[in-house]
Amino acid sequence: MNIESRASFAVRGLQVLLSLIAVFHLVAGAGLMFSITFQRFAVAGYGAELDWTARNIYFLRIVGSFAFVLGTIAAMAARNPLEYSIVPIGFIEFFLLRNIHRHLYSQELYEGFGVSSLTNDLTTVFFGVQAIALAGFLWAAHRK
C-alpha cells in the first residue's frame, strides 16, 4: 500500500471512528438528559452505584448535555477530519485525561461509586484503544 492509499485509508478510519464516537455520545447524551430509566441503565452499565436523589439525577442530565455536544462535534468533524483535526486531537486528550483521572483518583471512584477495579481497567482499555486509534489514523492521514 503506497503512502497516498494509506493516508486515504487513515482518513476513512477517522471518519468511521468519529462517526461511532458521535453516535454513542448523541444517544447517551440524549438518554441521560431526558430519561431516568436510561440514566439507571447507563450507571449500571458503567458498574457504578448511585443514590437516586434529585441532585444526582440533575447532575446526570448535565453530563448528558456535555456528551450530546461532544457527539455533535464528532459528527461534524467526521465529514472532513483533516480540516477539523482539532476535534480528534481533543478527543485523544479527553480520553487520556479520563484514563489518568480514572487511576489517579481510583479510590474515589471505588468508594464513591462502587466501581470495581476490573471495570475501571476495562474502561481504561476501551478509551485507551480509541485514543491510540485516533492518534494513529490522524498521524497516518497527515503523512501524504
Please identify what each model-predicted range represents:
Residues 27, 54-76, 90-93, 97:
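Core segments of alpha-helical transmembrane spans in multipass integral membrane proteins
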